[in-house]
Amino acid sequence: ADEAAACAPAVLPLGGGQRLLLFAWTTPDSGVPLAWAAEGHAGGVAVLPRLDERATQVVARQVQAARRPGDLVVVSLHWGGNWVDLVPSEQRRFARRLVELGVADVVHGHSAHHPLPIEVHGGRPILYGCGDLINDYEGIGPRGRLRSDLGCLYALTLARGDHRLQRLAIVPFQLRRFRLGHPSPAAEQWLERLLDEGCRSLGTSLERAGLDGWQLRWR
């Protein structure tokens, strides 16, 4: 894809004339080199060299050019290093700024191979790192206190009018022999403690939701 195509959203119909616009960018700290960036008519991916105000305006212009009234906008960001358990301050500033400018209804982050904490800012969910659901890392083993065999599905319920978050359910899975299944009780408890600890630092927390995982609580 050339630069225009790389920055263009995927458009999915939601019914009733509404659409979901999915925009995607990556950053060099995720391991994507700047040489892969689409430029002019040269193929590549959409890269934000830095998470600064200029990058914010780049995203804002692309969203504003494509968005129609009623559209739901997801900004998907492949950012940050692997095997990290803290959300970098520049990611928090950038994601919050996208919400404050009315650019993103959902910020969907990914790169680290394990789930990272979730924040709700201005009524909008910021998933800093969704981890891996299916990967080919089975057998590599844990990195420190982190592990890649545990992943999550995230189910978001948003208000139809203003797209504010109403509910966020999280269902954990464990990868065994390249198949997804229910995690062991010990693995599920470990993941719950890890996620809840990080979420509480961002003003959110996890609450058990029957046998199928957790739901997010926020102030």
What are these regions (language model features)?
Residues A1-R219:
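Acidic, metal/ion-coordinating pockets
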